Each structure stands twice: as structure tokens, then as C-alpha cells.
Amino acid sequence: MQKATYYDNTAAALFGGYSSYPGSNGFGYDGPPQPPFQAATHLEGDYQRSACSLQSLGNAAPHAKSKELNGSCMRPGLAPEPLPAPPGSPPPSAAPTSTTSNSNNGGGPSKSGPPKCGAGSNSTLTKQIFPWMKESRQTSKLKNSSPGTAEGCGGGGGGGGGGGGGGGGSSGGGGGGGGGGDKSPPGSAASKRARTAYTSAQLVELEKEFHFNRYLCRPRRVEMANLLNLSERQIKIWFQNRRMKYKKDQKAKGLASSSGGPSPAGSPPQPMQSTAGFMNALHSMTPSYDSPSPPAFGKGHQNAYALPSNYQPPLKGCGAPQKYPPTPASEYEPHVLQANGGAYGTPTMQGSPVYVGGGGYADPLPPPAGPSLYGLNHLSHHPSGNLDYNGAAPMGPNQHHGPCDPHPTYTDLSSHHAPPQGRIQEAPKLTHL
């Protein structure tokens, strides 16, 4: 036994310098790392240890000498460790083992018992950490290659709570990939779970279910999990991600419609303005209304027909119901009502709405007491069928044609105008006349 320890000790003492000196440079991997300040004392300490071990083994010295040898061996090595070296007075066979253990602890990288145990424990600890991480990566690769497996790292052990939190994070941030599967949470290594790759059949079923209702009740979720060979949690997270994606799509559609919206939505006000003002079917003829001739037209008729002033209040009453304020119609209508109201408002036309040359259709005029009230005897003989709405009504020989001649174009253009919205219901009656 002494020979075996002797050979081990001498080998450790002689070759310890060579095995531990690269360790100080960082290249040795036989044992635990050494502090750098021992690098200069390794060679001297190893030779002194070899001498100490040879002397102690060869001479079988008494206890005091072995204690001195222990102290001399420990001085170049680790300074704070001579206390456990001389406990009591061991027998001479125990002294060299204590020196060898101390020398091994001082020198470090040798192949005897205690350092090997320490290195083994460290290696087992590292093996407990690193291969576990390798396994998690391999399982993630396996999951990506073979989808449909429901077990993940986050579901096992103590990672359940962290996995739940990760599910919330994935539902918040992983909306873009809702069709593709779950997002792995960015955080803790303890609850790393792999991205679930769904098959096309699973995605079709999930999309179908999402199409019918976006929120899934728990019994239906359990049924879907059994049907698709997924876990409830995966289906829940898929639905969360899919809802986020749906919300994003709706936002994008809303922005697109609002950006393209003003052109179609802004175009209807143009016909609305035309209905409120003119109801013009031929937009190219609207500039003819800008001519200042209608007031002269009305005044000429006033002079020709010699309408008294008491005729104006009922005509103003007729013009009052028009609530639309566009300037051409409101400016021209009172004059034309004053001018043409008596001309076309003959008793033969009382049953139909009266067409007024300038501004559209007015209500039927109140029946006059007689044709002679306004001096319109010459118009009492004309039936309503002879009236055309181009301003060229058949006129009696007493009538002055002068003021009427320059303006047939104005009245012709006015015939294309439909009534204001208040009188729309009366329009078809006159179109058939």
C-alpha cells in the first residue's frame, strides 16, 4: 500500500508541474481552475513536495518530523491550509497520506482521489445544465419537423406558470403570425417552449372555427383539442393570435377605406348641390344662367302687361315655400313669377302645377276672379295644350313681342331644370303635357 501511494505521489509530484503549468495559462482542463498567483511557485513547490514525500516515505520519521515535513511542504503551496494538516498525532502511515492530500490540494491537477471527486462533481453539474439545454433545442427541432406533438418544455415541471405568462406575451405580440402558430416567449430559459408548427389540416379546422366564432368556449375548445391532437392551451393561444391578426387586418382595411374614401364620398355633394339649386340634367348649360337678362325680362313683362302692385303678394307667397337658397333660382324666380305668373296662370291650367320660366315649378296660382282682373282677356282663349314651355306661347295681337324676343334661350334652358326637392312629386305631370 505504501508502494502504491509512493508511486502515485511521486508521479503526481514529478508530473504535476507539467500538468498544472498549462492550467495556469488557461489551457489545462484536468481539474478545477487555479488562481494565477500560484503559477510561479508550481515548479519549486513540486520539487520540494517530491523531496518531502520521498523523505517521509523512506525514513518513516517520528510524528514531530512528519509535522515539520508537512509544514515545509505546505509553505510554498497554499498558505491558509496548514490547519487541517496536523490534526492530533496520526500514525506514521497516516502522515504521508495527509501530506499527499495536502500536496494534491495545493498543487491541484493530479489524478488522485479528492481532486478527481471535485472535478467529477463539477462535470456532473455541468452535465446537468448543458445537456438539458441541448435536449430542449433538439426537442424544438423535432417539434418543428414533426408537428402535432402537444408536449412542450413550458408545460413540464415548474415552467407551467412561466409558460402561462409566455402565452399572454405571445398573444399580445404574436398577432402577425396567427396563421402560423404560437410565438415562443422571449424571456426565461426555464420556460422556453418551442414554436408549434401546425399541419395544414389543423390550420383549416382552426380557421373554420374562427370564421364561425372568434371566441371559443371551453367545451368546444376541449373538443377541438381532442379532434386535432393539440392541447387546450395551444388552441387558446392560437385563437388569441388569430384575433390579433384579425384586428390588424380590420385596422388596415379601415385605413385603406378612409384614405380612398373622400373621392367617392365627396363626389355625391355635386349632384346634391345641383338638386338643391337647379336639378340640372345638362351641366354644360348652367353658365347661361349668369346673364343679367332675367330681371329685364321680368320688367319688360311688367310693363307689357301693366300688372298692378296688388298682384305681387300672392306671387310672393308662391315663391316663399322654396327653401333652397342658391342664388340663381332665388334671384330669378320672383321676377319671373311676377312676369309670367299671370301669362301662364290661365284658368285652364289651374288643375296642373304651373311652369314658371325662370326657376322651376310653382304651386298652382289661386284662381283669378276673372280674366279681366289683370287685363288678360287675350289669354283666356288659349287652351293649355297650346302652351309650350320654351317661352314661345301663342300670344294675342295686343301683346308686345319686344321684351320676349331676346330671351327664348333663357327660358329654353330653364325647361331642362327639374323642380326643387319640395316639388319633385309634381314633375311628372308636366312632362306629359
UniProtKB/Swiss-Prot annotation:
Q: Where is the composition biased (Pro residues)?
A: 79-94
Q: Which Gene Ontology MF annotations are present?
A: DNA-binding transcription activator activity, RNA polymerase II-specific; RNA polymerase II cis-regulatory region sequence-specific DNA binding
Per the record, what is one GO cellular component? nucleoplasm
Location of the motif Antp-type hexapeptide: 129-134
Which positions make up the DNA-binding region? Answer: 191-250
Gene3D superfamilies associated with the record: Homeodomain-like
Q: Where in the cell is it found?
A: Nucleus
Specify residue ranges for compositional bias: Polar residues: 139-148
Source taxon at top rank: Eukaryota
In this chain, composition skew of type Gly residues spans 151-182
Which terms are listed as keywords in the entry?
Developmental protein, DNA-binding, Homeobox, Nucleus, Transcription, Transcription regulation
Q: Which family does it belong to?
A: Belongs to the Antp homeobox family.
Descriptive protein name: Homeobox protein Hox-B3
